[in-house]
Amino acid sequence: MASPRRSEADLASPARGPGSGPPSPPHPGPDSARPLSRITSAAASPPPPGQRTAEPPTTISIPRTLWRLSIPLYITHPSLPNTPFITSLPRVSYLSLLLPRIRAFLPPSIPAPTSFHHEGIALRALPLGLLVDLYQPTLPWRLTVDQGDDWHVGDTFLNGVKEADFVRNGHAKQIMGMSKADTTALWNAVRDADYPAWARINARLLNPSTPIKHVPLRIYIPSSGGGGAGGATPAGSFRVMQTLVPPRTANRIPQTLGPTLRDLLPVLFPSSRDPVLANVVLHGAPVPFSAPLEGLMREAAYPDGWLCLTVVPL
């Protein structure tokens, strides 16, 4: 595991060098923990079924703030370790979207890379911010590109949207009822970091005519690693817990994070009020245990609709 990562704000103006793309948007001033903490009150009461949500009465909405967060990257190829491709990418985006630029940057004699690696670990096609939460690298994140699994990230994204829609409603009629143009526009908005375009389409997914049944929740639990020898868990691996969690309790009270963690992972989370043995982070920030799950989903889920929490031992 890499050394503890620094906050995005620590590198508001990442170094630039060969291969740098256009200047990246500045990192927002507030730490990402601040918008997440507002979810406890701002999103505690979801809108009535069928009513689209408006942005909360804050200077900058929580989702818009999260879409502005970016990660500085320092990318090299094994054959050119001293020729870095330096850029940054939004936390909600995907590394594979950089591959066309990296391929154009590398000499033609080098086979086109297809995968990204962190300390020898091939990275999965997950949102960049989730990868940072999992591996906690020092920033800028030093990655290598090489041959490996070819990513079809657009298809992966849309499959995730369909799965999240099914979990929310018990069916995927919301996304399946959209036109091809709309689903393409949804992915293009993520690809282009176009928050307004994404939000317009996503509002239709989050506000069906009936109340949602479950929150699309995935909890990522990193392993301690063991190098993989003798059957030990390979370094950098993690397991994913996914279960059906209703947005409200049997008493119709909004379901909050703390009791959910205690019920699903009682060994790691013996208390429903405070982190004792472990915490969870989302978009680089600890999440208040009092935050309602539906509020977290509406305000801080990744663009495919999944609320992805990473367990961090204390």
UniProtKB/Swiss-Prot annotation:
Cited Pfam families: ATG5_HBR, ATG5_UblA, ATG5_UblB
Keyword Membrane: yes
Ranges annotated as spanning the membrane: none
Effect of residue 152 to R: In strain: Guyane 11
One term of GO molecular function: Atg8-family ligase activity
Keywords: Autophagy, Isopeptide bond, Membrane, Protein transport, Transport, Ubl conjugation
Predominant cellular place of this UniProt entry's protein: membrane
Bilayer topology term: Peripheral membrane protein
Comp. bias regions, Pro residues: 20-29
Protein localization: Preautophagosomal structure membrane
Post-translational changes noted in the entry: Conjugated to ATG12; which is essential for autophagy.
Domain of life: Eukaryota
A GO BP annotation: protein transport
Ranges where the record places region Disordered: 1-59
GO CC list: Atg12-Atg5-Atg16 complex; autophagosome; mitochondria-associated endoplasmic reticulum membrane contact site; phagophore; phagophore assembly site membrane
Site of covalent link Glycyl lysine isopeptide (Lys-Gly) (interchain with G-Cter in ATG12): 162
Protein task: Involved in cytoplasm to vacuole transport (Cvt) and autophagic vesicle formation. Autophagy is essential for maintenance of amino acid levels and protein synthesis under nitrogen starvation. Required for selective autophagic degradation of the nucleus (nucleophagy). Also required for mitophagy, which eliminates defective or superfluous mitochondria in order to fulfill cellular energy requirements and prevent excess ROS production.
Subunit relationships: Conjugated with ATG12.
Family in the record: Belongs to the ATG5 family.
Name of protein: Autophagy protein 5
Lineage: Eukaryota, Fungi, Dikarya, Ascomycota, Pezizomycotina
Gene behind the chain: ATG5
